[in-house]
From Swiss-Prot:
Its cofactor is Zn(2+). It comes from the Bacteria. Zn(2+) binds at residues 121, 124, 140, 143. Residues 1-235 form the Deacetylase sirtuin-type domain. It comes from Bdellovibrio bacteriovorus (strain ATCC 15356 / DSM 50701 / NCIMB 9529 / HD100). 2 residues (Tyr-58 and Arg-61) present in a large hydrophobic pocket are probably involved in substrate specificity. They are important for desuccinylation activity, but dispensable for deacetylation activity. This is NAD-dependent protein deacylase. It is found in: Cytoplasm. The gene is cobB. InterPro entries: DHS-like_NAD/FAD-binding_dom, NAD-dep_sirtuin_deacylases, Sirtuin, Sirtuin_cat_small_dom_sf, Sirtuin_class_III, Ssirtuin_cat_dom.
Amino acid sequence: MDLRLFKNIVILTGAGISAESGIRTFRDQDGLWEDHRIEDVATPEAFARNPALVQRFYNLRRAQLRDPNLAPNPAHQALVDLENLWEGNFLLVTQNVDNLHRRAGSKNLLHMHGRLDRVFCLHCDEHFEWLLDLAVDQPCPHCGRKGGVRPDIVWFGEMPHHMEEIYEALDKADYFISIGTSGNVYPAAGFVRLAWKAKKIEINLKDTEISPAFDEHFVGPASTEVPRFITQFLE
């Protein structure tokens, strides 16, 4: 393929790319965590009502990132290879809150739903890298006040991060790839239609509700399909 035909590429990744590395969602088949709805531990109201419960949920999720067996998989690495070889504008947008893309070496990366390895203070709005457990009374490393340090995660009812930059990139994109996304979480599910002039590729375990909006589909695990597609793409 003549890559000179394409100058602006936007790639969207979802839970499917991280699941193969062993990232758990902590939801059972009913969508519950220890009999709690995820919405009950992932809203600003939940944090105000029961901060200990919310912190425990995210401490469990954050502990996964400290697991020595957790590592980026071939799909993450293939995206790094593509970024390094791409001569135009490259943007990787992820819905995932883990650190696997960055550990693999991705540079032009936006976490639209926040980062599990960061926290911020509600009192002073400072953000910090944080991989340890977080206590309810954790003093803010910047202002020293207690009770306001929370996960740097976009909760239900909050605005996803970097949307202006993402929308601008989608409007300019001439190639759009969606990997491992459910196709039913907005605003990300609408990205394929916002990339109005782009060639659109979907890589997923199965078809999604938005599959008809794509030009091509590749069905299978991200760890095999993404490297295969990118190898062919770069030939």
